[in-house]
Each structure stands twice: as C-alpha cells, then as structure tokens.
UniProtKB/Swiss-Prot annotation:
It holds the Pfam family DNA_mis_repair. The gene is mutL. It comes from Shigella dysenteriae serotype 1 (strain Sd197). The keyword DNA repair applies. Residues 370-397 are annotated as: Disordered. Keywords: DNA damage, DNA repair. Residues 378-391 have a biased composition (Low complexity). GO terms for biological process: mismatch repair. This is DNA mismatch repair protein MutL. One of its GO terms (cellular component) is mismatch repair complex. It comes from the Bacteria.
Length: 615
C-alpha cells in the first residue's frame, strides 16, 4: 500500500481515540472550553449516560461567525499562537483537537453568539471531508454544544461503552472535579431531564467549605485540615483529612489540581502519602483536595492528549515542597472543625435560560481567585515570603519608607512598667531614642546619619549582627522554629553528637530542632534569621563550636551564630538601611543610648568647614 495522506474524517477519528475515551471525556473537553471562554454558568444536559445526548450551554464570550468553521477544524485554537505560549500554558485547552475529534465520531452542533453580534450562528460538520455548514440561529450570548449519538459511526467503540448508570457516574465524577476547581462558576447537571447536581457559585469572600461539603461529604469536612503553604513561585492550598480518622470512604477523595487543571499525578500522590505514612496503615490512603500553583514555565502540560498528566521541570523540589506542606499541617493537628453551614439546600428547580454575559475576552484577563479560609497558616518555606491570602497583593518594603521614617522619629515603647502617668512628650523629643536620619549610603555598607546637627557613620553589617543576636536570643518564650523545606542531614563524630545532645535544650530555645541517629544528625527546623543562610556551611561550623564548649547558654550560642552569619546585602540601599535601623531601635534600644565599639563613629565636620571659610 503506498504512502498517502489520510482523509480528514479518518484522521480525526484516530485523534478521537486518544481524546474521546467515553462520554465523560467529551464532557470534560467541552466544559473546559466553556471555562476558558470566561463562563460563569454552565448547564450540562445528559441523556442515556451521554450515548444519546450531551448538551453543554454556557454564558461565555462566544465565538464569532467567521471563526465557527475554524472552531471545528483540527489544530485551530485561540489559546496559543507561538512556541512561547506553549511553554507557559495558562488555559485548560490548547491543542485545538477536541471539537474536530468529537465531531468525527458524533453528530455535533455548535451554536454561539458574541455580545457584538445581533444574531447567533450555528455550525456543524458532516461528510467524508468534514465540510462545515453555518446557518443563523436563535441563542443568547454564549455557546451551546450538542453531541448526538456518540460513536454512531464507530460501532467497535460504541460496543465498549458501559451501562447507562456507569457512564453517567463517570460524568458526575468529572463534574465534581471541575466544580472543586472553579468555585466561582455555577454548574448544573441533569440526566434524562432530571436535575442531579446544582453547584452554585461561591460569592467573592464567601465560604468555599459549603461546596466542599456538598461534593466531598460532611465526614471529610469535619476531618479536613486547611493548608496554606508557599515557597518562591510554589503555592499549595486546600485541605487534607486527618489521617487518624481516615475511613475507606474518605480514602476515595483524592483531588489534586495544578494551576487549576485537574490532575492525577503519581509524584504528588507519593509526596502526600509519604507525609501521612506515620499515621496511615499499610492498606489506607490519604484523603485530600489540594491546589498547587506553580510558574507555568516550570510545568509541561503538553504530555498527554487528554491532559491527564503533567511533567515538572524540578520534580524533586515540587515533591519535597508538597511533602513539607502536608507534614507541617499534620503536625499541628488542630482540633477545631471547619465551619459548617447548616443552611438547608433548596430543592432543585427548573433551570432558566442563560443570561446575557459580557462579551469581552475573559481568556485574556487574569483569573481572580478568592482567599481560602484556612484554620492554620504554616510558616513560610525556605526562601519564601509569608503566605498571603489569595491573591497575594502584599506591597514591597519600598512603599513603606514614609512609615519607616515616621517610626524613626518616634520613641519606642518603654519595656518597664510606668510608675505613674506622665504627660506625653512632643514627637521631636523622641530623637533622643533614635540614631537619627539617614542621609546617604557611603562605601556600600555604611550609613551617613544626621542627628541634632551632628553627623555620624553607622556600620550597617555591625548593626545587622546586633539585630540578629537580638532576634535569636530567647526571651520569655523560645524562638519560633521554622520547618525546613528539605531537612539537612549531616554526618557527625561521636564527640560532636554528644555535644549536640547536651546542647539540645539550649538549641531548642533558639528555634533549632534536630534529630540524631547513630552517625548522623538531621536538622529539621531553624529560626527565621537562618532561613536565608547556607546551612551546609553554617551548621557544621556551629557543631564544631559546640564540641569545644562545656557550658551551653542560649545567649552565648546566639551571639556566636549572629557573628558568623553571612550578610544578606553586599550593597545596602537607603530603604534597606532605614528598615534595619528601625528594627534595631525597636529591638535593641540600648544600642542607641550606648553604642558599642565598631557600630557608630562621629564625624567632625568643623575642620572641613573651617578650611572652606579660611579659603
């Protein structure tokens, strides 16, 4: 047989073998198209498990008349246009194969209208060459897709369909997964004319737990522990069930999403299972609903035609990040249950027609996500900023210079109890408790200060060391420990291990948590000032220092650590210097009254002024 180009219908049917596995696959592809179109309401009508009819109606932006024929063609899409787009996919669909593949194994009709059009248009493809016919129709703004007689022209595929109930259960599961991914969209599902599911959109700032309970059940909701974990461009949010109360029914709840895309990923499941293994039996599985947000450039979703899998560029980092996030929440084991909404669900009612939606290009707009209402917010992972509510709009420190300047001119609150009420002094008198005003940065690491007409130079690295020592020195309560994203495991000698065991209580007060075995020690947590340090260098040096000591005082250890920390700033900026001085004045007020050697040096300008006047 000679090499020849396959007819369009045959080529599409081959592609359909990868994309269209069963009716649930059709529903998934079409609903994802609706979400990409910016729909806020999606109605799904199913008949006979999807074998007879699948109808998807939405109020998205619609498709222009001139693009309807292209919409049913292979490799035609509005979601990517270049290789750069393919490397950072933010839409659910992007391959441009779904509609062409579905239309090749069914009788598909596409009806759509944009806000700019006065009338709707309907398109359908038929024949060996898949010629598209377009005609006018009546339809509100949005799109309706009807898929009739799925696999009517491929009897072998139709023969492999299961019972009507089984196929609809697969569709129901797909809708449950999509409803958990998009709390802001109303989704209605009906089967054989009867409404089966109604997931109402959660208003902005509303409680997502109501939909979570409707989908996953009250049992999961009562045992759910909220996760809010962040590290650089990685964010993990969602819920994981307490492993101590996991039942076989709960173990079936395993929903994971990567950048809003529902996913079954072995790497993610392994990380969660590993975090829960100490509390789960050999035959038990964790229950979770987790949302992983990652830089689109760091994940490849173009792996499987049905987009069930992804490939992470830094899979080990992602694995350890998820493991640490889940483990940290399980270690807290808060007992307060998630808030339940006892308001009864209204009885199902008839579904009205889709309302007219705005016809703007929703796909080009950034997705607005609502904050999760967590019961617990863990400490940020290594190199991360504190986890912020969704979305993260925390301003940078540069925008707060005015506030910092104001703090520099105020008297820090006295630590001792006042003996008697005294009249408040004017703000200008507070200069006696301040280093002064930062004029400029000299030689990249010194701040030129002015106070009461006097000029002085302050060594910023020395001020930073004093600040870190104050931050590391425990007060009435131990220093807060920050769990490491990846614990540091080191080999130690017998002498070093003995010293660590003797200093364990003092190190715990400093926020350093470790676990030792025969010849190794594993550092599991460190205080916040150490998070940006190279621990593979600092910790061995600290162990060597402890091995030479006979008395282990937290203050002495804090002083040694502060003097051996590497500075985070090779060159200081004005904003960084102002922030540092504000922190030093707040935590170390004694340094303002009695500056130690090497911190502050007065600058006498009188000789220079006199020389200028003499000339």
């Amino acid at each position: 047989m000679p090499i020849q180009v396959l007819p369009p219908q045959l080529a599409n049917q081959i592609a359909a073998g990868e994309v269209v596995e069963r009716p649930a696959s059709v529903v998934k592809e079409l609903v994802e198209n609706s979400l990409d179109a910016g729909a806020t309401r999606i109605d799904i009508d199913i008949e006979r498990g999807g074998a007879k009819l699948i109808r998807i109606r939405d109020n998205g932006c619609g498709i222009k008349k001139d693009e309807l024929a292209l919409a049913l063609a292979r490799h035609a899409t509005s979601k990517i246009a270049s290789l750069d787009d393919l490397e950072a996919i933010i839409s659910l669909g992007f391959r441009g194969e779904a509609l062409a593949s579905i239309s090749s194994v069914s009788r598909l009709t596409l009806t759509s209208r944009t806000a700019e059009q006065q009338e709707a248009w309907q398109a359908y493809a038929e024949g060996r060459d898949m010629d598209v016919t377009v005609k006018p129709a009546a339809h509100p703004v949005g799109t309706t897709l009807e898929v009739l007689d799925l696999f009517y022209n491929t009897p072998a595929r139709r023969k492999f369909l299961r019972t009507e109930k089984t196929e609809f259960n697969h569709i129901d599961e797909i809708i449950r997964r999509i409803a958990l991914a998009r709390f802001d969209v109303t989704i209605n599902l009906s089967h054989n004319g009867k409404i089966v599911r109604q997931y109402r959109a959660v208003p902005e700032g509303g409680q997502k737990e109501r939909r979570l309970g409707a989908i996953c059940g009250t049992a999961f909701l009562e045992q759910a522990l909220a996760i809010e974990w962040q590290h650089c461009d990685l964010t993990l949010r969602g819920w994981v069930a307490d492993p101590n109360h996991t039942t076989p029914a709960l173990a079936e709840i395993q929903y994971c999403y990567v950048n809003g895309r529902m996913m079954r990923d072995r790497l993610i499941n392994h990380a969660i299972r590993q975090a829960c293994e100490d509390k789960l039996g050999a035959d038990q599985q964790p229950a979770f609903v987790l949302y992983l947000e990652i830089d689109p450039h760091q994940v490849d979703v173009n792996v499987h035609p049905a987009k069930h899998e992804v490939r992470f560029h830094q899979s080990r980092l992602v694995h350890d990040f998820i493991y640490q996030g889940v483990l940290s929440v399980l270690q807290q084991q808060l007992e307060t249950p998630l808030p339940l909404d006892d308001e009864p669900q209204p009885a199902p009612r008839a579904i009205p027609e889709n309302r007219v939606a705005a016809g703007r290009n929703h796909f080009a707009e950034p997705a607005v996500r609502e904050p999760v209402a967590p019961r617990y917010t863990p400490a940020p992972a290594s190199g991360s900023r504190p986890a912020a509510p969704w979305p993260n709009t925390q301003p940078g420190y540069q925008k707060q210079q005015g506030e910092v300047y104001r703090q520099l001119l105020q008297t820090p609150a006295p630590m001792q109890k006042p003996k008697a009420p005294e009249p408040q002094e004017p703000a200008l008198a507070a200069n006696s408790q301040s280093f002064g005003r930062v004029l400029t940065i000299v030689h990249s690491d010194c701040a030129l200060l002015e106070r009461d007409g006097n000029i002085s130079l302050l060594a910023l690295p020395a001020a930073e060391r004093w600040l870190r020592q104050a931050q590391l020195t425990p007060g009435e309560a131990p220093v807060c420990a920050q769990p490491l994203l990846i614990p540091l495991r080191l080999k130690v000698s017998g002498e070093e291990k003995s010293a660590l065991e003797k200093a364990q209580s003092a190190l715990a007060e400093l926020g350093i948590d470790f676990q030792s075995d025969a010849q190794h020690v594993t550092i599991r947590a460190v205080p916040l000032p150490l998070r940006q340090q190279n621990l593979q260098i600092l910790i061995p040096e600290l162990i060597g220092y402890l091995a030479k000591q006979s008395v282990f005082e937290p203050g002495n250890i804090a002083q040694w650590i502060a003097r051996n920390l590497m500075s985070e700033h090779a060159q200081w900026s004005m904003a960084q210097a102002i922030t540092l001085l504000a922190d030093v004045e707040r935590l170390c007020p004694q340094l303002v009254k009695t500056p130690p050697g090497g911190l502050l040096q007065s600058v006498d300008l009188h000789p220079a002024i006199k020389a200028l006047k003499d000339e």
